[in-house]
């Protein structure tokens, strides 16, 4: 008999406000431990330098983390002008220093270049892989490998301010956009070089900024629970967002209770649906009058709802540490 995983069967999403100086995986493991969750996964790593929104999916919520990886993001970034580094941020070594000499008109023209759909060549200091190895491993050995440009979209690029040699921007962009690369490219266009000294992710998909919580706040709640001699879950679980918020933009298809068992066994079922739904379009599946979320699926060519990823409903508690 397979050993059950340690931790609680707890499902949901924590909007972590990651602090600077820590890896996203370190932050993930701390959240998992605080919630005593059997399973956890984040939805797109932030560099150690970066702070801000890092949605952490717990339990069955991890099945939908890819859809947050694919979501739009928003960042507040401050760049130091006049210096270019090998990593395009302040964690790297300065490789070139140049005078800052551009006009306001030149800056605005350069910023406009990055708006809309463009192509971006990823930094060598990224987790993208080449022949099975992350690019940053090659970079640390002084090896540069070919990288193909990738399409990105910058929906908004707002000028916030320029104080001395520090430029601050607000950027709303598509998945896979490297803010460090935008800043490095901008610095080259301005002829002075630039690198990131502050990066904060302020939004992922439509998640509210105000719902973010820090590791310090989580730790304080655990300590408070111990003082009150109550289970930490009493104070922590209200912070969780429902896991279906990861696919909130998907159209809903509601399955009547009578045929729900067939769907939950993986069978395609016929249900009344919106005529506007396209074949193979991803949908959010709910059950019965209470509209309980159970996963995602697609409408196949026969007009049947085919489950693609369903949650597991646990009846027994998992083992604890």
Curated annotation (Swiss-Prot):
GO terms for molecular function: RNA binding; tRNA pseudouridine(55) synthase activity. Its EC number is 5.4.99.25. Pfam families: TruB-C_2, TruB_C_2, TruB_N. One of its GO terms (biological process) is mRNA pseudouridine synthesis. HAMAP family: TruB_bact (MF_01080). Responsible for synthesis of pseudouridine from uracil-55 in the psi GC loop of transfer RNAs. Belongs to the pseudouridine synthase TruB family. Type 1 subfamily. This is tRNA pseudouridine synthase B. It comes from Shewanella baltica (strain OS223).
